[in-house]
């Protein structure tokens, strides 16, 4: 129901309509309408109000629209694309599996001193734990999604895109891949091929139901590399082979520690590995340690350090030391237990100590690309293709011949055999050893 104006106020307003402006009478019938238009038309009380009744218009206060802040993601996407910095804004990355040393030498330092030494390595630990969490999240996705019928290129690129997305470094701008990303190319070695195989451009290989595939990839943050590997098989007949190698790796990890001789670790690994046998299609095979493959130390920016960890018993008296980072990896085989170079090369790495003059212009240009994008981190031909490099094979072979770049051919046992691999990165800290790459899967 519309409100009415008081009678006295109405009379005053009607008299006002006949008032003069500057002593002159306003034109009859027009002044009210013109004044009404100037004052904004009809009053707020609606069309039934008298034209002479004007109620001042109030400006509506505009409510400020506050944009709702997007909630930070709390879980990884599928495929993995959520940055680690979003999932862990305070950089409180999960700690790896911490294990007490079996043969702790109490005379070395007091517990307080060792804890102090651990605290000095905060950047070191943060980088390693971030890289390890990226590895866990990407491999978790890979284990769920890799299926027979997929091409090896699709599998490799899926893993590598996940790593790059989670580090936030896609490696397409000069120097970006040196800040974080792939620690080395994704190895997808099948059946009798034990290591160092990744598809080159145009590769048409497809994963088969009967295949046993080693998935070996590295993640680095600021040059600190986590190296970890697992084996996938889709037929239960290979279960004992995978169990033998996984348990051998765990035994090596358990034995590792400050002042432990690497030759002794090799003996423990071999004993566990070769206690297994596997029956495949009616034939029983002993599982053998591949005697010419080893674990190794990891240096900053370099996947292979100076020390090795054999996977068979040896007389090597080299000791693990505080501050070392080791990749403890084991390989088991139903074949000869010995590998040789074979097949097309895909893995390469620049040597850190090479300084040889080059004559070939293509080699000089390629070396410049390698220095600016990979440094001494391993790379593969697909990575050069991805950077837009073309017709580089002549220059690459020249760098290999000159000893500036090292080629890593695929390593194979005898045809018809099956090989498996499991690997962990461990930090030899002053107080404990930390199995940095440990996850719920292995």
Swiss-Prot record:
Name under which the protein is recorded: Methionine aminopeptidase 2
GO cellular component: cytoplasm
Source organism of the structure: Verticillium alfalfae (strain VaMs.102 / ATCC MYA-4576 / FGSC 10136) (Verticillium wilt of alfalfa)
Entry keyword set: Aminopeptidase, Cytoplasm, Hydrolase, Metal-binding, Protease
Principal cellular location given in the protein's record: cytoplasm
Catalytic activity: Release of N-terminal amino acids, preferentially methionine, from peptides and arylamides
Compositional bias annotation for Basic residues: 56-72
Co-factor binding comment: Binds 2 divalent metal cations per subunit. Has a high-affinity and a low affinity metal-binding site. The true nature of the physiological cofactor is under debate. The enzyme is active with cobalt, zinc, manganese or divalent iron ions. Most likely, methionine aminopeptidases function as mononuclear Fe(2+)-metalloproteases under physiological conditions, and the catalytically relevant metal-binding site has been assigned to the histidine-containing high-affinity site.
